[in-house]
Amino acid sequence: GVACRCDSDGPTSRGNTLTGTLWLTGGCPSGWHNCRGSGPFIGYCCKK
């Protein structure tokens, strides 16, 4: 999957560890949660 920035990763994507996985459709898989809040973002940033 493609890494994405969770809210807990920090304010920018430069120099931070991206701990989320990008899911484009259907929300996060079972057992995962959306770790990204509101904002201009396509899909869901999911984390185990």
UniProtKB/Swiss-Prot annotation:
Q: Name the InterPro entries on file.
A: Anenome_toxin (IPR000693), Myo_ane_neurotoxin_sf (IPR023355)
Q: Which domain of life is it from?
A: Eukaryota
Tagged with keyword 4Fe-4S? no
Name any Gene Ontology BP term.
regulation of signal transduction
Alphabetic keyword roster:
Disulfide bond, Ion channel impairing toxin, Nematocyst, Neurotoxin, Secreted, Toxin, Voltage-gated sodium channel impairing toxin
- Where is it located? Secreted; Nematocyst
* Molecular function as annotated in GO: sodium channel regulator activity; toxin activity
Q: Name one GO cellular component term.
A: extracellular region
Disulfide-bonded cysteine pairs: these are 4-45, 6-35, 28-46
What family is reported? Belongs to the sea anemone sodium channel inhibitory toxin family. Type I subfamily.
Role this protein plays = Binds specifically to voltage-gated sodium channels (Nav) (site 3), thereby delaying their inactivation. This toxin has moderate activity on Nav1.1/SCN1A (EC(50)=about 300 nM) and Nav1.5/SCN5A (EC(50)=307.00 nM). It less potent on Nav1.4/SCN4A (EC(50)=820.84 nM), Nav1.6/SCN8A (EC(50)=about 900 nM), Nav1.2/SCN2A (EC(50)=1449.17 nM) and Nav1.3/SCN3A (EC(50)=1458.42 nM) (when measured as the increase in the slow component).
Q: What is this protein called?
A: Delta-actitoxin-Bcs1a
